[in-house]
Amino acid sequence: MPLKREDTERALQAMEACQSAGDEGFRTRAERLLTIFQSDLFQALLDIQEFYELTVFENQTAGRALTPGLKYRYHDEETPPLQHSPAHLSTGKSAEMLHLGDSGHAPIDGIHAYTPQMHVSPAKPVLLPSGHAPYYATSTLMNGMDGDVEYEEITLERGNSGLGFSIAGGTDNPHIGDDPSIFITKIIPGGAAAQDGRLRVNDSILFVNDVDVREVTHSFAVEALKEAGPIVRLYVLRHKPSAEKITELKLIKGPKGLGFSIAGGVGNQHVPGDNSIYVTKIIEGGAAHKDGRLQIGDKILAVNNMYLEEVMHEDAVAALKNTGDVVFLRVAKTLHQHHHQDAYNPPDITSSYSPHMDMSDYPQALSPSSPRRYSPIPKGLFLDDDISREPRRVVIHRGSTGLGFNIVGGEDGEGIFISFILAGGAADLSGELRKGDQILSVNGVDLRHATHEQAAAALKNAGQTVTIITQYRPEEYSRFEAKIHDLREQLMNSSLVSAAASLRSGKRSFFIRALFDYDKTADGGFLSQAVSFRFGDVLQVFDCSDEEWWQAGKLAPHGELEETGYIPSKRRVERKEWSRLKTRGREPVSGRSDYIVSYETVTQSEVHYARPVIILGPSKDRVNDDLLSEFPDKFGSCVPHTTRPKREYEMDGRDYHFVSSREQMEKDIQSHRFIEAGQYNSHLYGTSVQSVRQVAEQQGKHCILDVSANAVRRLQAAQLYPIAIFIRPSSLQNVLNISKRLTEEQARRALDRAVKLEQDFIECFSAIVEGESFEEIYHHVKSVIEEQSGPYIWIPARERL
């Protein structure tokens, strides 16, 4: 029960009576206690005690429910929030408050329960676990942050999946600016924290049980969480969101479009825990810059009549790009920014809205983005203790790109493992599957001893909603990966040594890449054991002695054998295609049989650079722009060369490599030092092999190249093997759907160019993508780049079929 002033007075009277009758030792101890009771400090503490009781009573009579021991909030309209800095939250020689037990208000370790929304001025006590003296803080800022803060005590029961959250920060690795606090970076779906529902992303942890983690290293905080036991009490500080003002803007597009960049969206958060679409850049001279009202940090709530709340990033991009000349924006402006612009480094995944610039502005439009300190991979450690090793049930809803993960294994009963999670795919968005998971069953089908083919079939035929029983087994997967690496090394060595002999002998194994789609059900007279495949699939041929059918197997993206059977021979493919063309009244160009392509021989190679990317076909410019603006940490552009004189505001090596003599550049072009070059306004412009290599090797980025298909072979000759992706339109209407701003005549010309491009350069393509919309095509392009980034890739072999 709380201490009353009248109780103290009765205690003093009793102590004085005992003092006169007791022995000498008792009298000495009683005098000390009386001195304490009569001191000014003790009287002040009694005053504070009465103040709090009065406040509690007023709040209770006003009908406010008290939740003792659970939430501690401070919302002081008169005084700014505490400064959350270890120097100001120390337990040193600060004013000490005596915490007295109260069964009604302090059930946990004698912590005094303060009522929510208590108005205490001018100072506020920081609540600490028992044994720690609170400090009366009068500072006004939390590491440079404005706005209100709140404190909360959250008790979690560690479950099978641990505590269910990830952390970042610490004195050795600050997460936000120079703040050493331990921040929550992710709430794991289905975990203890998610089920409790109170812990939020960006909360900072002050204490774990009785352990102070306000100014500690990251590893210390990790150990504190691991050693906290089955019941864990977290004392967290949270920065309350600022108020927002909703406003309507009208922008009129100019030569530079709307003139701003955005970031964010579902599955692509700009601010952790927030799916909003944020303005990240205002382009000078653009419509937004001239209007002057839109600012960095504003949220875009709607574009014209389309709301952008809880939408994918691609949907927001499409909404802004598919607008007319007059655009109405509904914008939320934050009245008080919590974070300094440079203090917080979320993923800079943005999309800009400006049309293509003329040749003189080309370098500025596609200049390499400066490296960002933030990685899309959270800097926080996902605690091993929080990753359950027990079997768990996961439900995945199949998306437009399938389930969004690859599998390996299935030989000699070794199990089926997840080897790759596609960024933005169904598995990635669920957050419940990870590399190293073993799949035990799919929709009730036991896969513990399944072959790779059986597992692939079970996943393919599982329907839209797939229930997976999986178990995290990283050690087994690591051993499996090591085995795959050894096999890959043997594969690379054997393919190089025996490639020439393989082609001469019908009994030797070799590798080919398919240059066409093959559907066995559409092939009249097909074998029941035939294997269907798509353009770009790699096949291992075991026996090519038969003139019509080769015994072969299809390889999965990571090199393991996926399916075996028979494929049509080169002779069969070319004969059937020749007959088809003649039936349609078309002859191969100049009567050449090499016009018809079937397979090319390939060998596996290991690369130690980011492969350049060449997009070909309709909408290639839009794809290039979106990749550069959306993922500046992964994609870059190289600096071109020119013989044009340098302008006053330009810098050599940043805007262009300015070549002093036209003769020198012509000589370099003839020496094959350029992958492409041309003339504009009597000046030479070109992209050199060295410029591409600098982006690929030194910056470690995929160099986006706006070049013709001829550049593919030149890059291959320079040992820089690009990812060349052809966007294949299926019809005139498909072109119009992909590029909505084209007229019908422009779309027809684009279709004709695409058909000719495929005829002339199909063997140069790494992959062919198709789709009903630009968004679908863009998603496929990103998937291809992800799969073919390396380090192990298939490259053309010197030997020909």
Curated annotation (Swiss-Prot):
Alphabetized SMART domains for the sequence: GuKc, MAGUK_N_PEST, PDZ, SH3
Listed Gene3D superfamilies: 2.30.42.10, Guanylate Kinase phosphate binding domain, Helix hairpin bin, P-loop containing nucleotide triphosphate hydrolases, SH3 Domains
GO cellular component terms given for this protein: neuromuscular junction; neuron projection; postsynaptic density; postsynaptic density membrane; synapse
Domain statement: L27 domain is required for targeting to postsynaptic density.
Native source species: Danio rerio
Domain L27 stretches: 4-60
Keyword annotations: Cell membrane, Membrane, Repeat, SH3 domain, Synapse, Ubl conjugation
Protein name: Disks large homolog 4
Record's subcellular location: Cell membrane; Postsynaptic density; Synapse
Stretch list, region Disordered: 339-373
Organism lineage: Eukaryota, Metazoa, Chordata, Craniata, Vertebrata
